From Swiss-Prot:
Matching HAMAP family: GatC
GO biological process: glutaminyl-tRNAGln biosynthesis via transamidation; regulation of translational fidelity; translation
Official protein name in the record: Aspartyl/glutamyl-tRNA(Asn/Gln) amidotransferase subunit C
Protein encoded by which gene: gatC
Keyword flag rRNA processing: no
Pfam families: GatC
GO-annotated molecular function: asparaginyl-tRNA synthase (glutamine-hydrolyzing) activity; ATP binding; glutaminyl-tRNA synthase (glutamine-hydrolyzing) activity
Alphabetized Gene3D superfamilies for the sequence: Glu-tRNAGln amidotransferase C subunit, N-terminal domain
Biological role stated in the UniProt entry: Allows the formation of correctly charged Asn-tRNA(Asn) or Gln-tRNA(Gln) through the transamidation of misacylated Asp-tRNA(Asn) or Glu-tRNA(Gln) in organisms which lack either or both of asparaginyl-tRNA or glutaminyl-tRNA synthetases. The reaction takes place in the presence of glutamine and ATP through an activated phospho-Asp-tRNA(Asn) or phospho-Glu-tRNA(Gln).
Organism expressing this protein natively: Wolinella succinogenes (strain ATCC 29543 / DSM 1740 / CCUG 13145 / JCM 31913 / LMG 7466 / NCTC 11488 / FDC 602W)
Length: 96
C-alpha cells in the first residue's frame, strides 16, 4: 500500500498531530513498511495451526493492585494535549 500525502494528512488529523515537513517523506516510507508487514501477516495461512503461545491459560503472574494518587500525573499527561480542561482531554466531536 502506498502512503500518499492525502492519507498522511488524514492520519495527522485523526491523531491530532502535525508531522514536520522535513520528516513527511520518511514517515510515509515507514508507514508503508508497516502496512506491507501487516499485509504479509494477513496473507499467512494459519487455519488449523495450534497456537504455540497464549496468556489465556492463566500463566501471567498476578501483581497486587495498589491504588496510588500522584497529583503530578494528570498534569504531565495533559501538557501534551492540544486542548484540555479540568483534567480532561477536549477532542473534536466525531459522532452526530
Amino acid at each position: 500500500m502506498q502512503i500518499d500525502d492525502k492519507l498522511l494528512a488524514r492520519l495527522e488529523s485523526l491523531a491530532m498531530i502535525e508531522v514536520p515537513e522535513e520528516k513527511k517523506e520518511s514517515i510515509k516510507a515507514e508507514l508503508g513498511e508497516i502496512v506491507n508487514f501487516v499485509e504479509n501477516l494477513n496473507s499467512l495461512e494459519v487455519e488449523g495451526l495450534e497456537a504455540t503461545f497464549t496468556t489465556l491459560e492463566g500463566k501471567t503472574p498476578m501483581r497486587e493492585d495498589t491504588p496510588m494518587n500522584d497529583e503530578e500525573i494528570p498534569a504531565l499527561i495533559l501538557k501534551h494535549a492540544p486542548q484540555s480542561a479540568e483534567n480532561y482531554f477536549i477532542v473534536p466531536k466525531i459522532i452526530e
